[in-house]
Amino acid sequence: VHWEDAEKQYIVSVFSKIDVDHVGANTLERVLIVFPWTKRYFNSFGDLSSPGAIKHNNKVSAHGRKVLAAIIECTRHFGNIKGHLANLSHLHSEKLHVDPHNFRVLGQCLRIELAAALGFKEFTPERNAYFQKFMDVISHSLGREYH
């Protein structure tokens, strides 16, 4: 994947403009609420029976922060995101058996949360496309062990 300097710079800069803990937690909450079948991967998290239960679940919040931290770490590896995520790809395919489509769902929810946090003047359609590309590369990289 070829990355333009403007794409990389904007993607990196976004994470200094948002509350990473809040956006990470909200992203995973959104995934679990809007795409309820994803809850099957989080049986050990306790009560996920309603949107309120999900939003008040500390394990969901903590895991959302962890997931976003892993996404942010990918900004240090633009030249080799696939290689960087190889171990996570193996874990998700071989041990956790996560449907690879859910990685795309996560990317969609993250872009929604970023748009809400940054506003339309900052998170323009062009910049949204940068993040779609970034999350598509991450999704593909995480799903590569499935092929």
From Swiss-Prot:
Gene3D superfamilies: Globins. Red blood cells. The keyword Transport applies. Residues 2-147 form the Globin domain. InterPro entries: Globin, Globin-like_sf, Globin/Proto, Hemoglobin_b, Hemoglobin_oxygen_transport. Heme b binds at H63, H92. Involved in oxygen transport from the lung to the various peripheral tissues. Heterotetramer of two alpha chains and two beta chains. This is Hemoglobin subunit beta. It comes from Lepidosiren paradoxus (South American lungfish). The lineage of its organism: Eukaryota, Metazoa, Chordata, Craniata, Vertebrata. The gene is HBB.
